[in-house]
Amino acid sequence: NMSAMLIAEYILGQKRANNTMPENPVLVESIVSTDMAKAIAKAYDVELVEVLTGFKYIGEQMLKYEKSGEKNYVFGFEESYGCLPGTYARDKDAPAAVCMLCEVAAFYKSQGKTLWDGMIDMYEKYGYYREGIATMTLKGIDGAAQIQQIMDRARQSTPAKLGAFDVLAVRDYKADTRKDLKTGEVTATGLPSSNVLYYELSDNAWCCVRPSGTEPKIKFYVGVKGDTLDGADQMLEELKAEVLKHFE
């Protein structure tokens, strides 16, 4: 998440400085990636599009934009170390991402700063966004059944709170619904069907729950926004613990 944000900030900053920002620019990220991307996109007047986990969905957006000509892809990423700083491919490109990060490092070095200094600058500019993952491993046939039971129970009963945070809305990507818990309004997510639940929480926090596609695990992605780095890290660890406790 942090390396992707450093690259995104650099790309958008350079395009603005050199007047090379395309019309209708778009950043694309997976739903489990950092919410700092929303703040960066807003600062540069760039649209942010969210897709399901898996870089193929970012590739689909690129193809869609190329065919329609209505939008221009600028940068795409997912939290699991996947980035693509161009439209020449349809999958994540690690060598290109590393080269971009080296360019970002050189940019900050020219100012007497490190990459970490640059990240601190971004935290101070956009807020202290922190993200993490908690997992439960449930092996074998029984484990697979247990994982599905956890997802079924979660769909049947929505908590009012997760830790210190109120649950504001729930997105069920399997049912293609987003329910606002205050108004009761239900709208479509607009994304393909997937066995994923996403909880929008108070104070810019969130939690996303999904079974792993490659391991006998259920994954709990969480994100928070704090006023300080230490404060955000503490909030994150507390939320991870409360989420595991709730879904056990």
Predicted regions and their residues:
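Active-site activation/catalytic loop segments of kinase-like enzymes and analogous catalytic loops
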Residues: 10
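Phosphate-binding and adjacent anionic-ligand microenvironments
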Residues: 6, 14, 18-210, 219, ...
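Active-site beta-strand/loop architecture of penicillin-binding DD-peptidases
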Residues: 223
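Hydrophobic, small-residue-rich alpha-helical packing segments that form membrane-like cores
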Residues: 1-2, 13
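A generic beta-sheet turn/junction motif
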Residues: 213-215
